[in-house]
Amino acid sequence: MNKSYLYSFFFHGSLVKRISVGLLLGLLLALIAPSLQGVLGFNLAEKAGFLGKIFVRSLRAVAPILVFLLVISAIANKQLGTKSNMKSIVVLYLLGTFLAALTSVLFSFALPTEIALKTQEGSLSPPNEVSEVLSTLVLNVVDNPINALFNANFIGILFWAIGLGIALRYASDTTKNVMNDFSEAVSRIVHFIISFAPIGVFGLVAETLTDKGLGALLDYMQLLVVLIGSMLFTAFVINPILVFWKIRRNPYPLVWTCVRESGLTAFLTRSSAANIPVNMELSKRLKLDEETYSVSIPLGANINMAGAAITITVLTLAAVHTLGIEVSFPTAVLLSVVASICACGASGVAGGSLLLIPLACSLFGIPNDIAAQVIGVGFVIGVLQDSTETALNSSTDVIFTAAVCWSEENKNS
């Protein structure tokens, strides 16, 4: 019975619980490894770090092709002919995502956070000016697509994926279905890799604490304060301001209702897609226009990614602060734009926002080896980060849909 329970837990149990167990076991191993070193002749926690390296390398391997196929599939299969007020909802989605990223920049500047990273001398070539960043950005955009995939040049990958996606919108349904199938296949591989996250987190935590000490946990706590603080500020300050702009009355009853009835469920499921039925039912109870919310809610689950933009921005700036790279405010605003674009491609993928961090890191000349370590840090704190991120993303879908619907009703009354 016990064996059956353990097997079910480790292979079919909640990912949140399994990652929590992996984190605690990694912490425990880091604490007892020094006392065992005299008996074993080596540091067991350092050896366990190999598990974390395998996990991070697997993520690095799948990330380029994942971004490439997902973006092509999403754009190629995008439906046209939506209602005119969808434009207002999409504007709110994109504006809210950008303002969330900008908020996280301000939080990161106010409370600079460093994380435990391993770097090699001479491995960095940080840009000095915004013009240099833009120059690098343009050159990366026009990279050869095969070369972009081979070198994990995510800017180039994104450019070619968008271009091919637009071109394939005029292809046959069979071709679009093939792209969908490839996208789904890679997503399944990602889900398989993510299922080993507890083992990877175990190795990452054990090695990090052995190498950097318990102080690394304090860095993660500060990182969580910046992350979750940015998300809470967005949920209860930025979003209400945007809602008030549309409906011209107290936005907080709507915000609290959506956070309570949509955000809580999303926090537990950690899936915007899984929360779509919940948001549909909530929209119905709010008596919103069915033709609008039936389109805007699924669309929001794919492009309304304020939480993901915050995650990408905060973790990227944490890496930047750790490496001692100087960042001007205009460059940080550019990062907010890039993070917002990245966030729109993070939907429907387990750990999607984390996998897109290398794209943002590339703006500052941070190599993929170090960016992959940042992804590993993201998985260590993912139990809280991913849940809060999803809660913000999903609840905002209903908030903005309701704001536009009520605004249209006010105009027509």
Swiss-Prot record:
Disulfide bonds: none annotated. The chain crosses the membrane at residues 22-42, 61-81, 89-109, 148-168, 189-209, 224-244, 305-325, 337-357, 363-383. GO terms for molecular function: neutral L-amino acid:sodium symporter activity. It catalyses: L-serine(in) + Na(+)(in) = L-serine(out) + Na(+)(out); L-threonine(in) + Na(+)(in) = L-threonine(out) + Na(+)(out). It is a multi-pass membrane protein. GO terms for cellular component: plasma membrane. Its main location: membrane. Keywords: Amino-acid transport, Cell inner membrane, Cell membrane, Membrane, Symport, Transmembrane, Transmembrane helix, Transport. One of its GO terms (biological process) is threonine transport. InterPro entries: Na-dicarboxylate_symporter, Na:dicarbo_symporter_sf, Ser_Thr_transp_SstT. It is found in: Cell inner membrane. SUPFAM superfamilies: Proton glutamate symport protein. Involved in the import of serine and threonine into the cell, with the concomitant import of sodium (symport system). HAMAP family: Ser_Thr_transp_SstT (MF_01582). Belongs to the dicarboxylate/amino acid:cation symporter (DAACS) (TC 2.A.23) family. This is Serine/threonine transporter SstT. It comes from Histophilus somni (strain 2336).
